[in-house]
């Protein structure tokens, strides 16, 4: 299953818009089953799909903490045929503190996606937060491919450079990194 992450340290680079529209296109035009994993505390991927994420439970946070059912059980259908959502909201902000002492804290998303039964989805598109953080590290470790939306501004390019540097560190530490 392809795992495509939309990542940039800079906010406002259209990560969420590109992620949601790409997922909808793959589902509708290609007839594939797609899951959007929203890893941004703003929950904008869900909001863009018409899902009220305020107070929604369970979310990606419970999946990452292992206190909830599986990814497949938490994923919710959307109005777009073939497109499901693993929602996020502000509760995700506590995740780094919740797992601070856990040795597998950077591999939670990868491990949970590895548990997804074969054939559940053809692709998982991951909407990353606008930061370099433990959540972003989880995203990069789980992804097989990375899309770096970049506006033609200094700060957007700087954010892109930070993500590329993070990928270099990941490659040095693990011997692998997602394709950009």
PLM regions: where:
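P-loop NTP-binding core
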Residues: 1-180
């Amino acid at each position: 299953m392809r795992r495509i992450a939309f990542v940039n340290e800079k906010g406002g680079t259209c990560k969420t818009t590109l992620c949601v529209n790409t997922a909808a296109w793959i589902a509708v035009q290609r007839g594939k089953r797609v899951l959007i994993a929203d890893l941004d505390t703003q929950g904008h991927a869900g909001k863009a799909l018409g899902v009220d994420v305020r107070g929604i439970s369970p979310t990606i946070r419970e999946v990452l903490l292992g206190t909830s059912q599986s990814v497949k059980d938490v994923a919710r259908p959307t109005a777009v045929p073939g497109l499901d959502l693993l929602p996020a909201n502000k509760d995700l902000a506590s995740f780094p503190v919740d797992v601070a002492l856990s040795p597998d804290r950077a591999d939670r998303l990868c491990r949970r996606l590895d548990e997804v039964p074969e054939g559940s989805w053809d692709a998982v598109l991951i909407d990353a937060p606008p930061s370099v953080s433990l959540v972003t590290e989880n995203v990069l470790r789980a992804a097989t491919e990375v899309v770096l939306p970049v506006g033609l501004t200094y700060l957007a390019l700087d954010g892109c450079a930070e993500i590329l540097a993070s990928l270099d560190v990941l490659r040095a530490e693990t011997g692998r990194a997602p394709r950009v």
